[in-house]
Amino acid sequence: MSVAAVAPVPKPESDPKAAVRENEKKWGKTLMDAGWTCIPSTIILRQQALGLDPVDMNIVLVIAAHWWKADQPAFPSKKLIADTIGKDPTTVRRRLAKLEKDGMIERILRPQPGGRHNSNEYRLSGLITGAEPYAKEEIAKRADGQAYRKARASKKGLGLVAVVKP
Protein backbone atom coordinates (compact mmCIF):
# COMPACT_ATOMS: atom_id res chain seq x y z
CA MET A 1 0.00 0.00 0.00
CA SER A 2 1.37 3.44 -0.91
CA VAL A 3 0.64 6.68 0.84
CA ALA A 4 0.35 9.84 -1.21
CA ALA A 5 1.42 13.11 0.34
CA VAL A 6 -1.27 15.73 0.24
CA ALA A 7 -0.37 19.40 0.53
CA PRO A 8 -2.42 21.20 3.17
CA VAL A 9 -5.00 23.63 1.88
CA PRO A 10 -3.93 27.11 3.03
CA LYS A 11 -6.37 29.05 5.17
CA PRO A 12 -7.33 32.45 3.69
CA GLU A 13 -5.83 34.31 6.67
CA SER A 14 -2.45 32.61 6.16
CA ASP A 15 -2.37 33.00 2.38
CA PRO A 16 -2.55 36.65 1.24
CA LYS A 17 -3.46 35.65 -2.32
CA ALA A 18 -6.38 33.57 -1.05
CA ALA A 19 -7.54 36.54 1.05
CA VAL A 20 -7.43 38.80 -2.02
CA ARG A 21 -9.42 36.25 -4.02
CA GLU A 22 -12.00 36.07 -1.23
CA ASN A 23 -12.24 39.87 -1.22
CA GLU A 24 -12.66 39.82 -5.00
CA LYS A 25 -15.63 37.49 -4.51
CA LYS A 26 -17.15 39.95 -2.04
CA TRP A 27 -16.37 43.27 -3.73
CA GLY A 28 -15.71 42.34 -7.35
CA LYS A 29 -12.45 42.31 -9.28
CA THR A 30 -12.87 45.83 -10.69
CA LEU A 31 -13.17 47.46 -7.27
CA MET A 32 -10.27 45.43 -5.88
CA ASP A 33 -8.08 46.25 -8.89
CA ALA A 34 -8.81 49.96 -8.36
CA GLY A 35 -7.28 49.72 -4.88
CA TRP A 36 -8.27 48.64 -1.41
CA THR A 37 -7.46 49.51 2.19
CA CYS A 38 -7.10 47.20 5.18
CA ILE A 39 -8.72 48.51 8.37
CA PRO A 40 -8.82 46.36 11.52
CA SER A 41 -12.41 45.52 12.47
CA THR A 42 -11.74 46.70 16.03
CA ILE A 43 -11.24 50.28 14.80
CA ILE A 44 -14.51 50.20 12.88
CA LEU A 45 -16.57 48.44 15.55
CA ARG A 46 -15.13 50.35 18.51
CA GLN A 47 -14.87 53.81 16.90
CA GLN A 48 -17.23 55.33 19.47
CA ALA A 49 -15.22 53.86 22.38
CA LEU A 50 -12.09 55.29 20.74
CA GLY A 51 -13.72 58.73 20.71
CA LEU A 52 -14.07 58.90 16.92
CA ASP A 53 -17.18 60.49 15.47
CA PRO A 54 -18.17 59.92 11.81
CA VAL A 55 -16.11 62.88 10.52
CA ASP A 56 -13.04 61.73 12.46
CA MET A 57 -13.52 58.19 11.17
CA ASN A 58 -13.72 59.43 7.58
CA ILE A 59 -10.48 61.36 8.05
CA VAL A 60 -8.82 58.24 9.45
CA LEU A 61 -10.08 56.23 6.47
CA VAL A 62 -8.63 58.72 3.97
CA ILE A 63 -5.28 58.72 5.78
CA ALA A 64 -5.32 54.90 5.85
CA ALA A 65 -6.14 54.78 2.13
CA HIS A 66 -2.94 56.75 1.47
CA TRP A 67 -0.74 54.72 3.82
CA TRP A 68 0.92 52.11 1.64
CA LYS A 69 3.92 50.90 3.64
CA ALA A 70 4.30 50.41 7.38
CA ASP A 71 7.51 52.43 7.59
CA GLN A 72 6.31 55.31 5.39
CA PRO A 73 3.67 57.68 6.80
CA ALA A 74 0.70 58.76 4.70
CA PHE A 75 0.74 62.32 3.39
CA PRO A 76 -2.63 63.26 1.85
CA SER A 77 -3.15 67.02 1.72
CA LYS A 78 -5.82 68.67 3.85
CA LYS A 79 -7.55 69.72 0.63
CA LEU A 80 -7.62 66.13 -0.64
CA ILE A 81 -9.05 64.93 2.69
CA ALA A 82 -11.65 67.74 2.64
CA ASP A 83 -12.65 67.03 -0.97
CA THR A 84 -12.86 63.28 -0.30
CA ILE A 85 -15.12 63.54 2.75
CA GLY A 86 -17.13 66.55 1.55
CA LYS A 87 -16.10 68.90 4.35
CA ASP A 88 -14.55 72.35 4.39
CA PRO A 89 -10.73 72.41 4.70
CA THR A 90 -11.11 74.45 7.91
CA THR A 91 -13.18 71.62 9.42
CA VAL A 92 -10.50 69.13 8.39
CA ARG A 93 -7.75 71.28 9.95
CA ARG A 94 -9.68 71.50 13.23
CA ARG A 95 -10.42 67.77 13.25
CA LEU A 96 -6.81 66.85 12.49
CA ALA A 97 -5.71 69.09 15.38
CA LYS A 98 -8.26 67.37 17.66
CA LEU A 99 -7.14 63.90 16.55
CA GLU A 100 -3.56 64.91 17.24
CA LYS A 101 -4.44 66.40 20.66
CA ASP A 102 -6.34 63.20 21.52
CA GLY A 103 -3.27 61.16 20.60
CA MET A 104 -4.94 59.33 17.72
CA ILE A 105 -2.64 60.64 15.00
CA GLU A 106 0.79 62.18 14.76
CA ARG A 107 1.31 65.04 12.30
CA ILE A 108 4.79 65.59 10.93
CA LEU A 109 5.57 68.81 9.03
CA ARG A 110 7.46 68.49 5.77
CA PRO A 111 9.17 71.87 5.28
CA GLN A 112 10.51 73.00 1.92
CA PRO A 113 13.17 75.62 1.27
CA GLY A 114 11.71 79.12 1.32
CA GLY A 115 9.42 78.59 4.30
CA ARG A 116 6.76 76.58 2.48
CA HIS A 117 5.59 73.11 3.44
CA ASN A 118 4.59 69.98 1.59
CA SER A 119 1.49 68.23 2.88
CA ASN A 120 1.90 66.88 6.40
CA GLU A 121 2.79 63.28 7.04
CA TYR A 122 0.37 61.38 9.26
CA ARG A 123 1.00 58.37 11.45
CA LEU A 124 -1.86 56.40 12.97
CA SER A 125 0.29 54.89 15.74
CA GLY A 126 -1.78 56.49 18.53
CA LEU A 127 -4.99 55.07 17.10
CA ILE A 128 -3.36 51.66 16.80
CA THR A 129 -2.14 51.80 20.40
CA GLY A 130 -5.57 52.98 21.57
CA ALA A 131 -7.35 50.16 19.72
CA GLU A 132 -5.05 47.39 21.04
CA PRO A 133 -6.90 46.86 24.37
CA TYR A 134 -10.21 46.52 22.51
CA ALA A 135 -8.65 44.02 20.11
CA LYS A 136 -7.29 41.98 23.04
CA GLU A 137 -10.74 42.08 24.62
CA GLU A 138 -12.29 40.77 21.40
CA ILE A 139 -9.68 38.00 21.13
CA ALA A 140 -10.38 36.97 24.74
CA LYS A 141 -14.15 36.93 24.07
CA ARG A 142 -13.62 34.68 21.07
CA ALA A 143 -11.38 32.34 23.06
CA ASP A 144 -13.95 32.18 25.87
CA GLY A 145 -16.70 31.46 23.34
CA GLN A 146 -14.67 28.69 21.74
CA ALA A 147 -13.89 27.15 25.13
CA TYR A 148 -17.58 27.34 26.07
CA ARG A 149 -18.68 25.69 22.81
CA LYS A 150 -16.05 22.98 23.23
CA ALA A 151 -17.17 22.29 26.81
CA ARG A 152 -20.82 22.11 25.73
CA ALA A 153 -19.95 19.75 22.90
CA SER A 154 -18.12 17.42 25.28
CA LYS A 155 -21.09 17.43 27.69
CA LYS A 156 -23.55 16.46 24.97
CA GLY A 157 -22.38 12.87 25.18
CA LEU A 158 -22.96 12.65 28.95
CA GLY A 159 -26.05 10.89 30.16
CA LEU A 160 -26.39 8.69 27.10
CA VAL A 161 -26.59 4.98 27.61
CA ALA A 162 -24.12 2.94 25.66
CA VAL A 163 -25.03 -0.61 24.78
CA VAL A 164 -22.14 -2.93 25.49
CA LYS A 165 -22.23 -6.39 23.99
CA PRO A 166 -20.74 -9.13 26.12
State where each predicted segment sits.
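The DNA-recognition helices of helix-turn-helix-type DNA-binding domains
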Residues: 66, 99, 112
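Alpha-helical residues within the helix-turn-helix
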Residues: 83, 100-101
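A short, conserved structural fragment
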Residues: 101-110
